[in-house]
Amino acid sequence: MGSAAVQGPLWGRAPETWSTTLEQKMRPLYLATLGATGPLEGKTYLDAGCGAGQAAADAAARGAAVSGLDASEPLLEVARRRTPAGDFRVGDIEELPFADGSFDVVTAFNAVQYAVDPATAVAELARVCRSGGTVAIGVWGDPSRCETEGLFARLRSLAPPPAGTPAPLGVSEAGVVEELLSKAGLDVQGGDEVAVPIEFSDLDQAWTAHTSAGPLQKVIDTVGTDPVRAVIEAVLEADRKPDGSLRQDNVMRYVVALKP
């Protein structure tokens, strides 16, 4: 079973909320990565694991002909409204429904870690990229520099994953993305880090935003709403800044590779 069967129902429960809250928090990563791929005017572009399509919309604004794939049809409905000319399809990142060499630029933001087999997912990104094209992967950075990982860790303690399940931020470990790209036959060019603070005006806003994400929905399904809300409130209160803001500072990173 591919990732779509598992992830699609989880991520599709609050698509409008996701698109206006946490997806917007990720936008610094999207914009930095798109900038690193070079000019997009007149190019074909795919975002695999596109969610509600913010990165695709940003690519379209730079002149690209955009496509997107995601496990969640409700999220794709938002993406289609944002970019009516785009080609957005539901499916598995491990089995992309596009022909070999279809795109000049292929990205995947915080998507590879949800694949049943990340190596297969990255091989698919490489397959649909044309020779001479670019593949870029964006992920959470060093967990020790991501305050939101403290929240993730507490939530995982409520509903531990089955034995043998890959660590959710395993692809964030040093060199992992680069190795996946290299094994897919791509030439790694480099990358960079991007500051991605996640800030909310109050705890209610934080709760609404965080529970639009698939992993939070899975934990709620397992243990119920009250324990999850208690964890979110406790962690965010502990991270409250001296100015009173509910802000978690994070570092994300991207890696860019070329297809020979």
Question: How does the language model describe each region?
Answer:
Residues 1-41, 54-58, 75-78, 82:
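Conserved class I S-adenosyl-L-methionine
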